[in-house]
Amino acid sequence: MAENRRMKKVNAMLREAIAKVILKDVKHPKISNRWITITRVSLSRDLQSACVYVSIMPHENSQEETLAALKASAGFIAFQASKDLVLKYFPDLNFYVEDIFSPQDHIESLLLKIAEQDKKTNP
């Protein structure tokens, strides 16, 4: 239980540090001036790697281009974030897009279908 609590705390600290670096230090043209939200960080049990899940608002560049830029900047982001966190080993960062809007769209479409069926059965 204590290990689980510690892992959650480290994940939250990593999330905050990475978000700060992306916001203030990264100058990549496909990253800066984009709405990038770090939805969650999942640290491996051995603390050597972390999966960083991001949500990228649609823009001129596709999500894939922004994700590729994040992956290319992962070393820099880790180096800058390690200045704020005191960890024995700073994990390797692996970025993944997490589409947080997809489940909402699915639920909304289901509700619309139910409303249409309701109109047909109860005019």
Swiss-Prot record:
GO cellular component, one term: cytosol
HAMAP family assigned to the protein according to its UniProt record, in alphabetical order: RbfA (MF_00003)
Quaternary context: Monomer. Binds 30S ribosomal subunits, but not 50S ribosomal subunits or 70S ribosomes.
Keywords annotated in UniProt: Cytoplasm, Ribosome biogenesis
Leader peptide range in chain numbering: none
Gene3D superfamilies attached to this UniProt entry: 3.30.300.20
Main location: cytoplasm
Gene expressing this chain: rbfA
Record's protein name: Ribosome-binding factor A
Lineage: Bacteria, Pseudomonadati, Chlamydiota, Chlamydiia, Chlamydiales
Localization of this protein: Cytoplasm
